């Protein structure tokens, strides 16, 4: 299991394959996605890598956050996320993950926050059919109708589908195929739609239900600030010391 990445949704477009097939894709941008910290068994009880992406002005970051980023020697980040990984898959702190972390043809799971729709009725929120257009129905054509029984059970059960707030929830879309990667511009194009609005933050990880291609880099594709890349295991030992 490898670490995922934090990306930003650019928008949707389409591309054409060599065979002339039209493929709708969502473009994700991976920019300044760096390892901020490690989570170890000794200190935290689990193993994970914490990533940060996006740039923030130091004046807009709390003192505690500035200290956290200073320890990792990275600039303040806009978005933080953790990815559970085994110890051998840890990436050194300060390393920047690049777009070729994923290879063309592999499948990924994408997590984002859906677009908020505000208060919505039953027909829009749950695809209810509504009431009849005529035959005694007036005004309440889009009503949801009855919500329960009579004296027995004498109540409306919990989780009954009703009008209410729609959208603005965390959703994971599984098994999206990577169609293209552009390392220079930090772009990843995946087939299909991705939850959220343009500019929203997205986490991308290897698909759980699909096999990881053999050519996928392990523990990942990244570049270090220094001239030499230290093994991930050594980075864990240094942080745990």
From Swiss-Prot:
SUPFAM superfamilies: Translation proteins
Entry coiled-coil feature ranges: none
UniProt keyword annotation of rRNA-binding present: yes
Signal peptide as annotated in the record: none
Pfam family, one: Ribosomal_L3
Region entry Disordered, spans: 140-168, 216-241
UniProt keyword annotations, A-Z: Methylation, Ribonucleoprotein, Ribosomal protein, RNA-binding, rRNA-binding
GO cellular component: cytosolic large ribosomal subunit
Keyword Secreted among UniProt keywords: no
Modified residues (N5-methylglutamine): 151
UniProt-recorded Gene Ontology molecular function terms: rRNA binding; structural constituent of ribosome
A GO biological-process term: translation
Modifications the protein undergoes after translation, according to the UniProt entry: Methylated by PrmB.
PANTHER family: 50S RIBOSOMAL PROTEIN L3 (PTHR11229), LARGE RIBOSOMAL SUBUNIT PROTEIN UL3C (PTHR11229:SF16)
Biological role stated in the UniProt entry: One of the primary rRNA binding proteins, it binds directly near the 3'-end of the 23S rRNA, where it nucleates assembly of the 50S subunit.
NCBIfam families assigned: L3_bact (TIGR03625)
Family the entry assigns: Belongs to the universal ribosomal protein uL3 family.
Oligomer status and interactors: Part of the 50S ribosomal subunit. Forms a cluster with proteins L14 and L19.
Protein name: Large ribosomal subunit protein uL3
């Amino acid at each position: 299991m490898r670490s995922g990445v934090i990306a930003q949704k650019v928008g949707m477009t389409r591309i054409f394959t060599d065979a002339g097939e039209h493929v709708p894709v969502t473009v994700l941008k991976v920019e300044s996605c760096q390892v901020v910290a490690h989570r170890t068994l000794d200190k935290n009880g689990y193993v994970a890598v914490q990533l940060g992406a996006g740039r923030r002005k130091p004046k807009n970051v709390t003192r505690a956050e500035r200290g956290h980023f200073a320890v990792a020697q990275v600039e303040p980040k806009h978005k933080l996320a953790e990815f559970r990984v085994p110890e051998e898959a840890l990436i050194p702190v300060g390393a920047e993950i690049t777009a070729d972390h994923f290879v063309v043809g592999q499948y990924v799971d994408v997590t984002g926050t859906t677009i908020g729709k505000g208060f919505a009725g039953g027909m829009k929120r749950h695809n209810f059919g509504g009431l009849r257009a005529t035959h005694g129905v007036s005004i309440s054509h889009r009503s949801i109708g009855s919500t329960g029984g009579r004296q027995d059970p004498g109540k409306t059960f919990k989780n009954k589908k009703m009008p209410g707030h729609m959208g603005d929830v965390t959703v994971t879309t599984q098994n999206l195929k990577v169609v293209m990667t552009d390392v220079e511009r930090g772009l990843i194009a995946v087939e299909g739609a991705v939850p959220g609005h343009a500019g929203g933050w997205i986490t991308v990880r290897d698909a759980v239900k699909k096999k990881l291609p053999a050519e996928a880099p392990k523990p990942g594709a990244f570049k270090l600030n220094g001239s030499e890349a230290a093994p991930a295991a050594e980075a864990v030992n240094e942080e745990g010391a």
